[in-house]
Amino acid sequence: MGHRDKRHSPPELHPPPPSSSLADAGEVARERFPGEHRRGLLPEQYFRWRGGEITRLEAFCDVVFGFALTLLVVSLEVPRNYGEMMAAMRGFLPFAVCFAQLVMIWLAHYRFSRRFGLEDPYTVFLNIVLLFLVLFYVYPLKFVFTLVFSQLTGGDIGHGLGWHEAAVLMRIYAIGFTAVFSLFALMYAHAYKLRDALELNAVEALQTRLAIQENVIMGVVGAVSFALSYVSPGLAGWWYFVLGPTLGIHGAVTGKKVRLLAEKLKLA
């Protein structure tokens, strides 16, 4: 009775052995977090998501994005005759474009939150500024695209709009566009500074740097559009079409770099 029964002793916990290489670190991460990077909406193959349960900050952000979408449709009414029905249909395309832009911003915010799960004061501050911009620019965003599609479809919105007014509208849109993606660049730059605390492996650190580049590209395009609005409001609007090929080339080149590094470190 004076000795302890070793059969009922709790098992000893041993920390994982130190890794001697990046490849070993990748193997340890995959063993400790099986399938972690494949959970949730739009999972990623080479990035382990560090965001756990939905936090109060994420929930608040989702509510604000939902409210912004509500503001897009708050002025819509049920058509009472054929003429009102056709007028409502003309508003479908600008609504769809605005909806797509807000969803794109929400997805970018969702991915950042899932990747890093940061809630330090600086990240919270950037999130609050982002939400302010999203809410503030809902009506300018809707007006700009309603005006554009009205001009393309022969509507009466925008008749009498002068060169100066059109230029001011494009500047307002450019300021919002540039500010939103500059905030995302700052958020990713902050996460990159914390890469050691977040235990980012080489592939995740590379993807974080590439996300900074992508958001800087978006911000630069918006800034150039702002400058072009002083020359030609129309040219300032068409300038945004350079985003397609620019981001396509950037994604193809950087995606190959990520795959090659992942294969080198045996993370695939």
Residue ranges and their predicted role:
Residues 2-268:
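Multi-pass alpha-helical transmembrane bundle typical of ion/small-solute transporters
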